[in-house]
Amino acid sequence: MDINIININKKYKNRKVLSNINLNISSGEIVGLVGDNGAGKSTLMKIIAGIVKPESGIVKLDELTFEKNRIEYLKNISFVIEEPSLYLEMSGLDHINFIAKLNNISQNKIDEIIKFINIGESLKKRCSSYSLGMKQRLALGLALLKEGNFIVLDEPTNGLDIDSSIELRKKLIFLAKEKNISILISSHILSEIEKICDRVIFIKSGLIIKDNFNLKKETLKNIILVVEDRIEFLGYISKNNNILSLEEIESNKFKINIESNLINSFINELSNKNIHYTNILISDVSLEDEYISVKRSE
């Protein structure tokens, strides 16, 4: 199922929280949504889930829209918010049985989800007695139980231990790659986004500032090196159009961002121009590197 988000705008009172949001998520793609607190991530996710109404714009799941095809739209989407909304007087098991009955889920699938939730006998107790972590496990389990064609997860590892986070990651990758389910995931834990997502969208102050950071295909590299003559080196860099970014970490120590296929020619040019350097280190560009770079460019 392809998801198309078209010209979404949202205001709260006189404050604009989303401005002309346009993005596409392909069938089977896992997309990360990254931004500071208050950037508009949760609002966008709630609009996608049909919880919040935008001022203008539309969200389409293939050709389904919330406004015209509400029942079918909601059948095809599973949504987990940062602070799960549960019926506190019902038990976790009551929630599971209710969703399973609505969606004609097999007992094998129910047993698999109960194992994933992993809260023991507490599953039979009222949700009012659950910790945040237990509520998060249950909400995730219910989303995975339903298995809509589009899963939206807002801070899904909040309250989860390491083993549960790893298990969730494996399950989401399986759903995307084996069952062609589309997934949008927001998290402040960039390492989690990096491990699971195909592509990352950066949002700031309600605006998408980059939507094509492809974690699977990026060919960018970081080069960290110490140069003997700082002025000479900076003069060379100012004339080199292949350098995508430059940061002076400390005196005479620089961090450069460059395409991987240009590294050898860059190093050869330094030698040819007698620009001497020491302690050169080459590494992949991480999501954190890109996040910092994007923030600095604004």
Map each language-model feature to its residues.
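Conserved ABC transporter NBD signature motif
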Residues: 57-68, 72-73
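ABC transporter nucleotide-binding domain
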Residues: 170-257
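Conserved ABC ATPase "signature" region
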Residues: 97, 101, 107-123
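The feature captures the beta-strand-to-loop junction immediately N-terminal to the Walker
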Residues: 34-36
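Helix-to-loop junction immediately C-terminal to a conserved catalytic motif
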Residues: 49
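Catalytic Walker B motif of ABC-type/P-loop ATPase nucleotide-binding domains
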Residues: 151-155
